[in-house]
Amino acid sequence: MNRNILEEMLQYLLIDWIVGDQFEIQLNQQLWSLIPNNDVRRLVSHVIRTLKTDCTETHLQLACAKLISRTGLLMKLLSEQQELRTVSMTAWKPRMNRKSRSRMRS
């Protein structure tokens, strides 16, 4: 193989890897509020990055469609779980009764 072609291929792969890493880092930051668990968030970011790069190949499109669907379901479940946590935390905040508030004012 011609050395120049090999160098160009390696350079392309390196640029693709760097851009992919930047994409994954940004995605990880955006998912932070939705997925507080770092390991799960990194997994989801990596899956999305993989889908973005590998699903353009024709022979992988059916498998990718299934993975995209299941990833969407996972994101929906995680979102619902986060909403329940938020509601639960709000409901359990201690509330001061009227007597306590009136004592604090005096």
Curated annotation (Swiss-Prot):
Endpoints of the signal sequence: none
One Pfam family here: LRRC37AB_C
InterPro entries to which the protein is assigned, alphabetical: LRRC37, LRRC37AB_C
Domain of life: Eukaryota
Name this protein carries in UniProt: Putative protein LRRC37A5P
Name of the encoding gene: LRRC37A5P
